[in-house]
Amino acid sequence: MAAAQRPPVGVEEALTRIATVADAPASTQAAQALWRMPLDAPVIVHDRASGSSWRRDSATGPALPVVLRNDQPPANTCITIDGAPAVLLLLPLPGDRDGLATLFWHEQWHCVQAALGLPATEGDTAHLDGEAGRTALRLEMRALAQALSTRDEHQARQHAAAALGYRALRSDAAAPPTRALEEEAKVERNEGLAEYSGRAIAAATHGGDATAAAVDALAKADASQSFVRSAAYVTGPAYGLLLDRWSPAWRRGLSAGATLPALLADALGVTWRGAGIAQNGAGYGADEVRTEERERAKERERRSAGYRERFLGNDAIRLPLRNPSISFDPRSLFPLDDAGTVYTPLTVRDEWGELTAVSGGLLSRDWALLSVSGGVVDGAGSRWTGPGWTIVLREGWRLERGGDGWGLTKEWGSGVGDPGDAGE
């Protein structure tokens, strides 16, 4: 009989820490109460150093290896294994208990969101990287922080109404304004509700509430260099906690088209697009924010020119995408107008293999084309490297340089993807 495969150092400890979070009675009760269904998908951990994944059948059982599909790049996410949802977490885990609990319950929510009638959606929030969008968002977040932290009921409502006003102001500056609201709402329903759930359930573990953590997250986000997809991670919990305060039943019957700001406006009894915004924003440091964002806009133009040279120049390497699986850091996205978005770092898997770009790559808006920096390219056979990236090709694919630069070619005689191949 073959010896059982042993996990890398740290895997057993990680699974034990996760079990402690998952089995805490206060947390499981809070999860059930929050969404009226259990959040108990099995958990898989992925060790990036060895490239291996592991799970346990029980809290005390041995770690067992798991093989991820080619279209499941390692990421903190919810995946499907044997037809059922499972939480996938990357090692190393967050070092603190609250951080781990927030991440764990965030991903658990993703595993039930479809059952809640809230399917995963992606929103195009590139307007959050422009000067006007960032300015209004930062002022909205500052107003949300004050609404959460003040004990005076009247003042809290005023700050909440101001936050809604800044959301309306930001959407009015976008083109078209209604689309901006809809796109932001998509991300808030997806990542915002997941992060709200993670923070609320994590706080319940020690009998507290998530307000202090939400306010701290808003303060840290104020200095963020990219809000394109990450803003919902802080605005979602803030709106959720304010709704808990003024409309406790808001989660019941939550629809796939719901927007958290509109729900809050209803709870406050205000017309949300005409909410009572303090025009000068003095209480939120508006002059300071506007000055900082004007300077950032100038720096953004310089970065944009550099990215265009790297990813749109003649020596850039362009890789076609047909059915990509992509993992990235949502805090570091850089929209490049109609050309797409720069993701740093980035891992992409497709039919031709896997690319890892620690220095980033440009994805077209329809995710049909990936571009990475050209320049000095080295390699042979299946493994190639370039400035800040590595490609590992599947059998039957080659990276070659032609008259138009580097590109991928398929060897039809290899039997991989030949015409008539029925596939998997």
Task: Pin down the residues of each PLM region.
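Active-site-proximal alpha-helical
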Residues: 178-210, 215-278
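Non-catalytic terminal regions of proteins
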Residues: 20, 233, 252-424
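Active-site recognition of the HExxH zinc-binding catalytic motif
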Residues: 102-115, 195
